[in-house]
Amino acid sequence: MLKGEDIVVLLRLMIGSSSWTVRSLDAEIAIPRSVIQRSLVRLEQAGLLENGRRRVNVGRAEELLVHAVKYMFPPVRGGETRGVPTAWAATPLRDKLADSGELPPVWPDPMGSVRGIALEPLYGSAPEISRRDPALSELLTLTDGIRVGDARVRGIAEELLRARLGSAAAA
């Protein structure tokens, strides 16, 4: 069974170079090496990493992210809090949708810049990732758009995610 950190690792592998190491991933995504190592094993067992290679099976990853992630990791919302905006409240979805005036979904973070409704991230280091790696942060917010958005938000998030995954596969 995949875990939230597996999705974070998978997304990072999709946008990074093929010369990654567990140590470099640890430094980039703020997930301990032991957790990354176990995550890589689960990703390989799930057929998302090609056996014995450092390549993501992009077709399977896209299928997982677009069709299954919302069921595997249903949104867990909390109360009003300060945090980092996600889903439709963050780039790139924010640029495609009109502001509804409601409190936005945020990953709880005391250093966050926005007041909104807490949304538990796929992995606890998501707010830190958003400060370190804008490209990965965008993929995580698109994934959250798929997890928590209505049909319109999900449709736009799926389209943007597919475009980014397609360009990552071509690189």
What is each of the regions a protein language model found here?
Residues 1-12:
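Short alpha-helical segments that sit at the start of domains
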Residues 53-69:
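Accessory beta->alpha helical hairpin/"wing" motif in late/C-terminal subdomains of nucleic-acid enzymes
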Residues 13-17:
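Short helix-to-turn junction characteristic of helix-turn-helix DNA-binding domains
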Residues 30-45:
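Short amphipathic alpha-helical interaction segments
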Residues 44-55:
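A short, conserved structural fragment
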Residues 18-28:
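Short acidic, hydrophobic short linear motifs in intrinsically disordered regions
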Residues 74-159:
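Exposed, interaction-prone assembly regions rather than primary DNA-binding/catalytic cores
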Residues 163-171:
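N-terminal, charged low-complexity regulatory/assembly segments
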